[in-house]
Amino acid sequence: MAIFIRKTHPLLKIMNHALVDLPAPSNISLWWNFGSLLGLCLIIQILTGLFLAMHYTADVSMAFSSVVHICRDVNYGWLIRNIHANGASLFFICVYLHIARGLYYGSYLYKETWNIGVILLFLLMATAFVGYVLPWGQMSFWGATVITNLLSAFPYIGNMLVQWIWGGFSVDNATLTRFFAFHFLLPFLILALTIIHLLFLHETGSNNPLGINSDADKISFHPYFSYKDLLGFFVMIFFLTTLALFMPNLLGDAENFIPANPLVTPPHIKPEWYFLFAYAILRSIPNKLGGVLALLFSIFILMLVPLLHTSKQRSNIFRPLTQIFFWLLVANSIILTWIGGQPVEQPFITVGQIASVSYFSLFLIIMPFASWCENKILSLN
């Protein structure tokens, strides 16, 4: 009876169907590991964040000092802080690779799973943004000021909206307190949505590299993919610990070692590296409202991808034309990330504008047209 308790117990039965006896396609590659890696990232971030919250003080006069206190006086506080800060970067690397895999292999045709995923991305970006403000360094303060100020672009309600978010007439104590509250709350919302994301995924089953129905060739998740995921865990933890122990400030900004000063503006205000592609799109449009809308659309365009799928095949694996444009999109996103970190001057302005137009064109026009051309070529044969 003990052997089958996982199949009969009301709680264990749910876990069993999700992690043990789940039928999975036999040919899913390493690209399918990123879902579980994201789960691990989320757990690491929640646990390290919880310990940091025990020692952090959400007050403008003490926030910076409390972070210094964590790094100097708390047992292994420096390690917890470095893992949390670099864990966010690794989280976004895994997210972007997970999305890229979904785009390449046509996983977006599971519309419910995909759309929940896009909402998860938006929440993750919001969490990372409010978290970046908490150390109350120069880039934290000015990043919060510049990004929240963008809401003033909305007609009629803009200025009121900004003051409502700030809790006053400038970024101050009320802003920091509420951002800390949001940063604590949002990961649990992400956790809840992740469960819904998995629920929708298990309704349809996983996609596979060929993009075809794999019902005839399924294997159980455990032990095959559980061990495969475990290997991914070890590799990711190795990278995270290497980053946190040897190069903890590699992906951070030197300006954040200076306490926030509303009277001194940093020479170049920029967000963390994982937002730079969207920041470059925002900056490439001279109009403020247009820039804000383009920024939002650069994320929410992912929701249109299932509607723009014109190909008769699901995966890109047998579609050389679409493959070329997919890799162009990847290269374009890397260029946008680089441009976002550069000062606003020529030739960076022009390159950013070309890359921004290319980004939207590839999604909305070029890739759907390439799929249509491939359909025509196939029908000729």
UniProtKB/Swiss-Prot annotation:
Heme b b562 binds at residues 84, 183. One of its GO terms (biological process) is mitochondrial electron transport, ubiquinol to cytochrome c. It is found in: Mitochondrion inner membrane. It comes from the Eukaryota. One of its GO terms (cellular component) is mitochondrial inner membrane. SUPFAM superfamilies: a domain/subunit of cytochrome bc1 complex (Ubiquinol-cytochrome c reductase), Transmembrane di-heme cytochromes. GO terms for molecular function: metal ion binding; ubiquinol-cytochrome-c reductase activity. Binds 2 heme b groups non-covalently. CDD domains: cytochrome_b_C, Cytochrome_b_N. Its main location: mitochondrion. It is a multi-pass membrane protein. Keywords: Electron transport, Heme, Iron, Membrane, Metal-binding, Mitochondrion, Mitochondrion inner membrane, Respiratory chain, Transmembrane, Transmembrane helix, Transport, Ubiquinone. The chain crosses the membrane at residues 34-54, 78-99, 114-134, 179-199, 227-247, 289-309, 321-341, 348-368. A ubiquinone binds at residue 202. InterPro entries: Cyt_b/b6_C, Cyt_b/b6_C_sf, Cyt_b/b6_N, Cytb/b6-like_sf, Cytochrome_b, Cytochrome_b_C_euk/bac, Cytochrome_b_N_euk/bac, Di-haem_cyt_TM. Its cofactor is heme b. Gene3D superfamilies: Cytochrome Bc1 Complex, Chain C (1.20.810.10). Heme b b566 binds at residues 98, 197. The cytochrome bc1 complex contains 3 respiratory subunits (MT-CYB, CYC1 and UQCRFS1), 2 core proteins (UQCRC1 and UQCRC2) and probably 6 low-molecular weight proteins. Belongs to the cytochrome b family. Heme 1 (or BL or b562) is low-potential and absorbs at about 562 nm, and heme 2 (or BH or b566) is high-potential and absorbs at about 566 nm. Component of the ubiquinol-cytochrome c reductase complex (complex III or cytochrome b-c1 complex) that is part of the mitochondrial respiratory chain. The b-c1 complex mediates electron transfer from ubiquinol to cytochrome c. Contributes to the generation of a proton gradient across the mitochondrial membrane that is then used for ATP synthesis. This is Cytochrome b. It comes from Sphyrna tiburo tiburo (Hammerhead shark).
